[in-house]
Amino acid sequence: MRLLAPAKINLALDVLGRRADGYHQVVMVMQTIALADTVTVAVNEGHGAIRLAGGTEEAPPDADNLVYRAAQLVRETAGLSCGVDIDLEKVIPVAAGLAGGSSDAAATVKALNRLFRLGWSDREMETLLARLGSDIPFLVRGGTALATGRGEIVHRLPPAPAFWVVLVKPPFGASTPKVYKALGAPALPDPLPWPQAMKPATTPPGTAAYRMIEALKTGDYGNVLEALGNDLEQVTLEWHPVLKEIKVQLTRFGCDRALMSGSGPTILGFTASEATARSVAAAMEEQWGPQRYRVLIARTLEREEADEWNVDCCR
């Protein structure tokens, strides 16, 4: 079985503070895009191991890979003993703030759920995957969603209006734990002043996520642009001033706005036009390609379309 594992971007990311358990309380609006890895999974009765092939130098096919860990978690939870062969074809840049590894893990669990006829619901898979990482549950369904708690509690939102992003990934990564630590978010009281599992209707006013939820209700691309925000951007841009230059150039070449995705370092340029996206990408590639920066383009991808992709893959 072959499944596509799409990347995610953050349309809004607010860090509300540091909880007593050490995690940060966040409220985020996330969106999948049509930039995807491919995960091929097969049951192998000839051995009882997990065999992972593919990957990259930055994400090698070993026992520390999220795909391997996801497969092992499924086997332990479901009491399975037969072998699993997994091949991973990477397209999404690694350590880029795009959740490529998380999406690969989610695709692996979805494939094994189907292959072994486990009958797990999306919510059950999200709960299971939250044990591996905070952003993995969102990738089970994708589309446009609100993520709260430490990022593992997911609520679907109205789909974002269609748009394109130009992605510029520098030849360096950003450590998510280090970025969060450097942000210096205030300690939160215990118990929290609001529900840990916030819903769209209870998202704190004044946050980028609140503004984004309101913008999505209108279905207007311009309103979405105005609501974009990322609390982590200030940290990563301070460490790597070149990212500020990339943001300026993306808008200078034709994008409507630019924003860092997640903890970075990938910078996103937003446009409603595919032609503009391709034009900006060509200009950025000419400028930054020789310095080993990766330049990609992708459009928004809603859950229903992602499901159709994977139905086609399974035929």
UniProtKB/Swiss-Prot annotation:
It holds the Pfam family GHMP_kinases_C. ATP binds at residues 93-103. Disulfide bonds: none annotated. GO terms for molecular function: 4-(cytidine 5'-diphospho)-2-C-methyl-D-erythritol kinase activity; ATP binding. Coiled coil: none annotated. Pathway: Isoprenoid biosynthesis; isopentenyl diphosphate biosynthesis via DXP pathway; isopentenyl diphosphate from 1-deoxy-D-xylulose 5-phosphate: step 3/6. The active site is at 8, 135. GO terms for biological process: isopentenyl diphosphate biosynthetic process, methylerythritol 4-phosphate pathway; terpenoid biosynthetic process. Gene3D superfamilies: 3.30.230.10, GHMP kinase, C-terminal domain. It is an enzyme of class 2 (transferase). Its EC number is 2.7.1.148. PANTHER family: 4-DIPHOSPHOCYTIDYL-2-C-METHYL-D-ERYTHRITOL KINASE, CHLOROPLASTIC. Belongs to the GHMP kinase family. IspE subfamily. Catalyzes the phosphorylation of the position 2 hydroxy group of 4-diphosphocytidyl-2C-methyl-D-erythritol. This is 4-diphosphocytidyl-2-C-methyl-D-erythritol kinase. It comes from Heliobacterium modesticaldum (strain ATCC 51547 / Ice1). The gene is ispE.
